[in-house]
Amino acid sequence: MLNINGGKLFMKKILVTLIARVLSTGVSFGADHKANIIVVTHGSDTDAFWGVVRNGVEAAKADTGADVQYRNPPTGDLNEMASLIEAAIAQKPDGIVVSIPAPDILGGPIKAAVAAGIPVISMNSGAGVSKSLGAVMHVGQPEYEAGLGGGEKSKGLGGKNSVCFNHEPMNTALKDRCQGFADGMGEKLNMVEVSSDFDDIKNTVIAHMSSNPDTGAIMAVGPTGCDPTIAALKEMGKAGKVVLGCFDLGPAIVDGIIDGTVNYAIDQQQFLQGYVPVVVLHLNHRNGTLPGNSINSGPGFVTKGNVELVKKLAGKER
């Protein structure tokens, strides 16, 4: 079993403590040191996951006093996101934060930002290509390893004949999650692409389960896919009878863990993905410092044994 819990969670607590200490040293962040930072993500307006990321961005803005703007394509359109990055470059900010779900579409604008002398930090997706595109660091979780840990856990719980539902098939990070999950299960990848619509996903899950009644393990790569999967399993009377793992947290996933429908969630702590890059770019603008390495915000397992610890923060800071 891949151990992705204790040590890394402890390191994340240390990271937050160190940042808090830097921000509370008593040194004033005056006007001369005020950084202009633009955050551009691919998260759609309807995806609750990105609301938590934005909460992290806003918290960092408040803590540092930096001028921070958050931008995203309302529907998650990646070509529109590329245009948003290009528009950000034209403003000549002191730093840009980006997610990189599709390097083939977003790589050009990111390289252009770097060529213009703008420090870029990638977050959430793009860990594998971040350095090659010129980003100074990445804040996120190693997606394949996270999926691998999930697959090993599902297999250990007796799951077999697995399926991975992917609501963002263009996102390489989510493909990595599914591949890791399959490898952890010791099975061939069975990835089913779905839309981001709740009812469509629910109906797809029901149809798949009806056509493949021997399915014993499901992975949903985010709340967008997990929430309707929970509803589908309950409607079919299969809640608690199929091993269900989900990436990320939200109210429905937390409730699902408590009632036994969801066996575990893989938490990447997206609040940190919004918070840390802003703080790092602000401090880089102020005194020229950068961390020596990228920062893993996750992964870690949330199960019935520890869910109460994170319940109050789900959908807000986790």
Name the predicted role of every residue range.
Residues 86, 94-114, 181, 190, ...:
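Hydrophobic alpha-helical
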Residues 33, 184-188, 272-318:
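Hinge/cleft segment of the Venus flytrap/periplasmic-binding protein
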Residues 36-64, 69-85, 91, 99-103, ...:
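Extracytoplasmic "Venus flytrap"
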Residues 62-75, 161-164, 181-199:
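Short beta-strand elements in bilobed, periplasmic/extracellular small-molecule ligand-binding domains
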